[in-house]
UniProtKB/Swiss-Prot annotation:
<dbReference type="InterPro" id="IPR047867">
    <property type="entry name" value="Ribosomal_uL22_bac/org-type"/>
</dbReference>
<protein>
    <recommendedName>
        <fullName>Large ribosomal subunit protein uL22</fullName>
    </recommendedName>
</protein>
<dbReference type="InterPro" id="IPR005727">
    <property type="entry name" value="Ribosomal_uL22_bac/chlpt-type"/>
</dbReference>
<comment type="function">
    <text>This protein binds specifically to 23S rRNA; its binding is stimulated by other ribosomal proteins, e.g. L4, L17, and L20. It is important during the early stages of 50S assembly. It makes multiple contacts with different domains of the 23S rRNA in the assembled 50S subunit and ribosome.</text>
</comment>
<comment type="subunit">
    <text>Part of the 50S ribosomal subunit.</text>
</comment>
<dbReference type="Pfam" id="PF00237">
    <property type="entry name" value="Ribosomal_L22"/>
</dbReference>
<dbReference type="InterPro" id="IPR018260">
    <property type="entry name" value="Ribosomal_uL22_CS"/>
</dbReference>
<dbReference type="GO" id="GO:0006412">
    <property type="term" value="P:translation"/>
</dbReference>
<dbReference type="InterPro" id="IPR036394">
    <property type="entry name" value="Ribosomal_uL22_sf"/>
</dbReference>
<keyword id="KW-0699">rRNA-binding</keyword>
<keyword id="KW-0689">Ribosomal protein</keyword>
<dbReference type="InterPro" id="IPR001063">
    <property type="entry name" value="Ribosomal_uL22"/>
</dbReference>
<comment type="similarity">
    <text>Belongs to the universal ribosomal protein uL22 family.</text>
</comment>
<dbReference type="GO" id="GO:0022625">
    <property type="term" value="C:cytosolic large ribosomal subunit"/>
</dbReference>
<dbReference type="GO" id="GO:0003735">
    <property type="term" value="F:structural constituent of ribosome"/>
</dbReference>
<keyword id="KW-0687">Ribonucleoprotein</keyword>
<dbReference type="GO" id="GO:0019843">
    <property type="term" value="F:rRNA binding"/>
</dbReference>
Length: 119
């Protein structure tokens, strides 16, 4: 696989209300694939994380097309990762005056595309 990382274009979605572990499961499937192949994979995977990842991928390709003048057919997903964001902490009332903490994780999704050929 040959990827030109000099003209790498990326898009970032921040504060997505989803666990980064669950998002990484989806990102591992599209890393290194062509744009067209990644679109097909994301359309048909049964995970909720596919929707924000698909949005970020389309945004990265739009950035490449508009800002760099690259052809979407030649683009390959060169990098895709999810970092942990801040955790929203909530409390659930329990019996006898107690409260359990509920953690609602967020993540930052980054997808980078570059011209190249996927094999």
């Amino acid at each position: 696989m040959t990827i030109d990382t000099q003209t790498e274009v990326k898009a970032i979605a921040r504060y997505i209300r989803m666990s980064p572990i669950k998002v990484r499961r989806v990102l591992d499937q599209i890393r290194g694939r062509s744009y067209r192949e990644a679109l097909i994979i994301l359309e048909f995977m049964p995970y909720r994380a596919c929707e924000p990842v698909l949005k970020v991928l389309r945004s990265a390709v739009a950035n490449a097309e508009h800002n760099e003048g690259l052809d979407p057919a030649d683009l390959v997903v060169s990098a895709a990762f999810a970092d942990a964001g801040p955790v929203l902490k909530r409390f659930r009332p329990r019996a006898q005056g107690r409260a359990y903490q509920i953690r609602k994780p967020t993540c930052h999704i980054t997808v980078a595309v570059a011209p190249g050929s996927a094999e």
